[in-house]
């Protein structure tokens, strides 16, 4: 998991010419802020977003040299820009990316169709792709992974987000020969509770909940039920969690623990007593699974929001007793332990994926196949002709419920959640129905073709 990067790259000092599309979001900003700090490894060649002026102002705010900026609207403009010294090409049209002589594309638009099409175009030209848009990856990732192999380049999910961090942690655990019982992540935002005042806080919302103090310490699974009940006015699941665990499942073969995840409200030190088999007092009816929890902490404790974890079986009583004495998270019965990374640093970490792809030909993945699918179920009656648009920062479909099923348990014709995005319904959908591919106008959808080919690969 940890390595000496100076040693790893000591015989390879090549500088990657990198492009980014979808640059004006949080991930894109953090990545662009990091690139100038890594001049021995990376050079920004292209920034692509919907508004050139916004992109230019973003680069200026990050102190990029404006003399390098070249707004380009066609291939001829790009050819002229490439004749200059160390240009930064500013695009609005992503179809021009393959002509910009980049080594690696960082794809961060968050648009499933656009992300997949842009990645495909670059991979076909031998350009490595680091995918930030998990909404695309969980649908087209297997296809793009295979396409990259065909063109002798790398397709990777970008470091700095939970899927890549968890995949990396899992690879470390597997290398150590430890048995994986469960793995997962914390949901995006912490549940913060002050035991002295009884004040609960979540995303700026507060409530006085004195009863929660009575269930602060874990006393069997009944404690989890009581916490969930007390916090019923606050959201205890999020669609992006399902998407991220879909990515992890496809990359590792680990299956969803259950259709809607357990989402316990719990503390990090409790994980090894919760994500264990039912017969040992936990929540799992099967092992080798992915899941999500809501992190409960005091105001004076560090955040775990967006952190990742793996539960392993303790293989030797003496070893794990020693580790428990050092403060590591070991279950009360001594049979299970939790290993975790309590962070994800977004674009600060993402350059490692770029450098690994360019210098070493390494991907986050060692496999990528359709192991799970996000099912979308109508929460109201929909009419033929309604358009299913994503909304908000978290890329949600209105009035649609999500589940994550293993591919073998899902209906054969089920439409992945993010394949539905931006599509028009071709027929009425009743409340409670699973949205299927034949209910969508997919005429001309490259994403649908990639999904189909990825399933059949």
Regions found by a protein language model. Give the residues of each.
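N-terminal glycine-/serine-/threonine-rich beta1-alpha1-beta2 phosphate-ribose binding loop
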Residues: 1-121
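C-terminal catalytic/substrate-binding lobe primarily of soluble NAD(P)-dependent oxidoreductases
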Residues: 2-10, 206-457
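Short, ordered loop/turn segments at secondary-structure junctions
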Residues: 50, 110, 134-137, 160-161, ...
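Short gly/pro/ser/thr-enriched loop/turn and capping motifs at secondary-structure boundaries
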Residues: 54, 136-145, 162-166, 187-191, ...
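Short acidic, glycine/serine/threonine-rich loops at helix termini
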Residues: 59-60, 141-144, 167-170, 191-197, ...
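Rossmann-fold NAD(P)-binding glycine/threonine-rich loop
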Residues: 114-121, 125, 134-153, 158
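A short hydrophobic/small-residue beta-strand
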Residues: 128-130
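Rossmann-like NAD(P)H-binding beta-loop-alpha module
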Residues: 148-149, 156-229
């Amino acid at each position: 998991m940890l390595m000496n990067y100076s040693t790893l790259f000591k015989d390879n000092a090549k500088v990657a010419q990198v492009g980014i599309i979808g640059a004006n979001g949080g991930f894109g900003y953090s990545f662009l802020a990091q690139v100038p700090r890594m001049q021995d490894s990376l050079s920004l060649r292209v920034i692509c977003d919907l508004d050139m002026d916004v992109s230019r102002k973003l680069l200026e705010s990050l102190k990029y040299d404006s003399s390098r900026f070249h707004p380009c609207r066609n291939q001829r403009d790009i050819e002229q820009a490439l004749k200059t010294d160390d240009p930064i090409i500013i695009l609005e049209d992503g179809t021009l990316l393959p002509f910009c002589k980049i080594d690696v594309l960082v794809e961060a638009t968050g648009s499933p169709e656009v992300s997949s099409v842009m990645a495909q175009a670059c991979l076909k030209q031998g350009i490595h792709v680091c995918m930030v848009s998990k909404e695309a990856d969980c649908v087209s990732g297997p296809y793009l992974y295979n396409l990259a192999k065909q063109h002798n380049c790398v397709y990777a999910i970008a470091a700095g987000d939970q899927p890549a961090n968890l995949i990396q942690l899992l690879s470390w655990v597997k290398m150590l020969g430890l048995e994986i019982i469960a793995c997962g992540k914390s949901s995006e935002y912490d549940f913060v509770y002050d035991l002295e005042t009884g004040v609960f806080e979540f995303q700026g919302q507060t409530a006085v909940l004195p009863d929660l103090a009575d269930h602060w310490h874990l006393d069997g699974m009944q404690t989890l039920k009581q916490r969930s009940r007390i916090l019923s006015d606050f959201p205890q699941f999020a669609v992006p969690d399902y998407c991220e665990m879909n990515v992890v499942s496809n990359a590792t073969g680990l299956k969803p623990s259950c259709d809607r995840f357990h989402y316990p409200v719990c503390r990090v030190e409790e994980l090894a007593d919760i994500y264990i088999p039912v017969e040992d007092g936990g929540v799992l009816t099967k092992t080798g699974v992915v899941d999500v929890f809501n992190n409960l902490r005091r105001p004076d404790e560090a955040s775990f929001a967006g952190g990742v974890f793996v539960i392993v079986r303790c293989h030797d009583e003496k070893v794990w007793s020693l580790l428990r004495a050092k403060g590591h998270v070991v279950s009360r019965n001594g049979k299970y332990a939790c290993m975790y990374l309590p962070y994800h640093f977004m674009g600060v970490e993402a350059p490692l994926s770029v450098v690994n792809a360019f210098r070493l030909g390494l991907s986050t993945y060692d496999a990528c196949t359709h192991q799970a699918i996000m099912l979308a179920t109508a929460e109201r009656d929909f009419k033929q002709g309604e358009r299913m648009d994503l909304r908000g920062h978290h890329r949600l479909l209105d009035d649609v419920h999500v589940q994550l099923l293993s591919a073998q348990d899902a209906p054969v014709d089920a439409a992945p959640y993010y394949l539905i995005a931006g599509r028009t319904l071709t027929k009425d959908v009743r409340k409670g129905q699973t949205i299927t591919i034949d209910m969508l106008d997919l005429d001309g959808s490259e994403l649908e073709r990639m999904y189909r080919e990825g399933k059949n690969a």
